[in-house]
Design a protein with these regions (language model features):
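Catalytic machinery of carbohydrate-active enzymes
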Residues: 1-387
Length: 387
């Protein structure tokens, strides 16, 4: 049985979808699960035992042509994708992105069973024949609900009659399409995101950190600067206050991409000038190198951005700062975490990329003291567990 799992981008979204892919693979271990993904994100799926084959596709290139209405190029790209996917003879396609572009990917597969999210926009619903219903849950649970349509879809499909799907105890859930969880699975077991770091990558990260910091008894705090939305970011001066307030007892690693390397130049110059215990990795890591360094951190502090979800997937304790996005939908769901919001604001979760108030007070109003207190609390919890 060949399954195509569709979640093309981005970091957090792909990681949120890994629980659904694992759910499918654990219940259909003989199936071959392929995942189609934007090439720059493929690193996130490497060494994942629940993904048999990664199929890179230039989603960003297609979207760029779409915005300019380059219809001929779009058609050629889709036709090339169809020719690439057809030899796999997919039995099932699972779309947890719910966009027109992912609907077109489903169409290109020719799969008779096509699962997707309910209530989607951009005509995505035209391309799926089994749809989930509940869109009010955490996004991980939304994706799982799509995956959990599979037993029913298989039973109702002519695939079963053609004998192309095995119906052994391992493959179908005791022939009960309504059974979606195993009795031995906890909430965290089901909803945990997956990101796998190799032993070699982990050893390299630990060696790198040991070489940088002289005081190896101090905890290492990962701080993820910036976000894809300006409204989700915590101001630079707040990060500075946090670092200064804890520099006597902690080492810090700063994470971010090329954008953050530019945006936080002044902060990095300041911590270097003051000789604060900060390791600047802004714009200097691949996704996998970042993952290995995050895994070596004792606590990670972040706004709602990709590296936050990487840390959660790696089961690191996190302090998550939320403003315009809703943590009940996008925040930590498993592991050891604290979520901080500025509850003085009545517009939390507005999902606006530009604040109509002129400044994102939901984020700038988060006090570094609150963050420090939550970091210390998590460090104490981790310390007590070690003892």
């Amino acid at each position: 049985m060949n399954i195509l799992f569709v979640r093309l981008s981005y970091i957090g979204d792909i990681l949120h979808a890994t629980a659904a892919a694992r759910w499918i693979k654990q219940r259909y271990p003989n199936a071959i699960l392929h995942w189609i993904v934007t090439p720059s994100m493929a690193e996130l799926l490497e060494h994942n035992p629940y993904v048999d084959h990664i199929i890179p596709w230039e989603r960003d290139v297609y979207e760029a042509h779409s915005k300019k209405l380059h219809l001929c190029t779009m058609w050629n790209m889709w036709w090339d994708l169809r020719k690439q996917l057809q030899p796999y003879q997919f039995d099932i396609a699972v779309d947890v992105q719910g966009r027109l572009i992912t609907g077109l990917v489903l169409l290109a597969t020719g799969a008779p069973i096509r699962l997707g999210l309910g209530g989607t926009k951009e005509l995505n619903w035209l391309f799926t024949n089994y749809k989930s219903k509940n869109r009010s849950k955490h996004v991980i649970e939304q994706y799982l609900e799509v995956a959990q349509l599979l037993p029913m879809a298989i039973q109702q499909s002519s695939l079963k009659d053609r004998g192309t799907v095995e119906t052994s105890n391992q493959d179908l859930l005791a022939n009960d399409a309504s059974e979606t969880t195993r009795s031995d699975e906890s909430f965290d077991d089901i909803n945990q995101m997956d990101l796998f770091v190799t032993d070699e990558e982990q050893q390299q990260a630990q060696s790198e950190i040991a070489h940088i910091f002289t005081d190896k008894e101090r905890p290492t705090i990962g701080i993820v600067l910036g976000s894809s939305w300006q409204t989700k970011s915590w101001p630079s001066e707040k990060w500075q206050q946090l670092i200064e307030s804890m520099s006597y007892r902690s080492n810090f690693i700063c994470f971010g991409g090329p954008k953050e390397e530019k945006d936080f130049t002044s902060l990095m110059q300041y911590v270097e000038k003051e000789e604060l215990p900060v390791y600047n990795k802004l714009g200097k890591t691949t996704l996998r190198e970042m993952a290995a360094l995050l895994q070596a951190c004792d606590v990670v502090v972040s706004c709602d951005t990709g590296a936050l979800h990487m840390a959660i997937a790696l089961n690191r304790p996190v302090v998550a700062l939320f403003g315009p996005t809703n943590p009940a939908e996008w925040g930590p769901l498993t592991g050891l975490y604290r979520v901080i919001q500025n509850h003085d604001m009545d517009c939390l979760g507005c999902r606006k990329r530009k604040c109509p108030k002129g400044k994102a007070y939901c984020m700038s109003g988060i006090d570094p003291i609150w963050v420090k207190e939550n970091i210390i609390e998590l460090l104490d919890v981790v310390s007590s567990e070690v003892r």
